[in-house]
Curated annotation (Swiss-Prot):
Organism: Serratia marcescens
PANTHER family, A to Z: DNA ADENINE METHYLASE
Chain's role: Overexpression leads to hypermutability. May be involved in methyl-directed DNA mismatch repair, initiation of chromosome replication and gene expression.
Catalytic activity: a 2'-deoxyadenosine in DNA + S-adenosyl-L-methionine = an N(6)-methyl-2'-deoxyadenosine in DNA + S-adenosyl-L-homocysteine + H(+)
Entry annotated with the keyword Methyltransferase: yes
Family stated for the protein in its record: Belongs to the N(4)/N(6)-methyltransferase family.
GO MF terms, alphabetically ordered: S-adenosyl-L-methionine binding; sequence-specific DNA binding; site-specific DNA-methyltransferase (adenine-specific) activity
Binding site for S-adenosyl-L-methionine: 10, 14, 54, 181
GO biological process: DNA replication; DNA restriction-modification system; methylation; mismatch repair
Taxonomic lineage from the root: Bacteria, Pseudomonadati, Pseudomonadota, Gammaproteobacteria, Enterobacterales
Protein name as annotated: DNA adenine methylase
Amino acid sequence: MKKNRAFLKWAGGKYPLVDEIRRHLPAGDCLIEPFVGAGSVFLNTDYDAYILADINSDLINLYNIVKLRTDDFVRDARTLFADEFNNSDQFYLLREEFNTSTEPYRRALLFLYLNRHCYNGLCRYNLRGEFNVPFGRYKKPYFPEEELYWFAEKSRNATFVCEHYRDTMAKAAAGAVVYCDPPYAPLSATANFTAYHTNSFSIADQQSLAHLAHQLSVESRVPVLISNHDTELTRDWYQHAALYVVKARRTISRNILGRSKVNELLALYR
């Protein structure tokens, strides 16, 4: 199966792990993703239906607009990728517009622009909920037209919702399969990157997610696959699951020389 890339750049995106994740995802009628992120697993699987959720309202707004107004969105977004908008002055003007706009369609256009023009494609907000990633200084940011159209085509069988992971997992019924890609447990005290939205993801949340996954698999017979870093802590959280270790390359790092392979853990409850 050809691998399809997401149209967004995303911290911890699962494109490099798609083959391994597909190998361990059980068959079912509907795939539920409480942490959809850039959607690489959704884009590279073939379930009859999808329920795709995230706590980031900007992300879900963008996905619904790409699904419902594909041609308009591609046409209008392309104009923001002209050379005249690829400089720091324009970037910060458009970032300010994004942070003050309440118009969903315009916010969706600007969210894609910011994602492709900001530093490392990071998605980060301050405590006021304002997007605050600096300008990335890329020579020619890529406009993901082909990826947008593929996403829209796949979205015909998908429902996008902005909600807490517990509410999404509560939708799981017979025939469903759940894939969870929560904000990763930190490898070290300085490696924590969970503030991609104003709602941070705590150790208690990680433990609660593991408990909920175990509960779903036992009480509702719904299989749940979770991905995370392979650490003593995550192995303890997922002690009731079958564990599979995968090598992957973490691509978001402040120190380029520090970009090395770390073990990833796939925990399957079934």
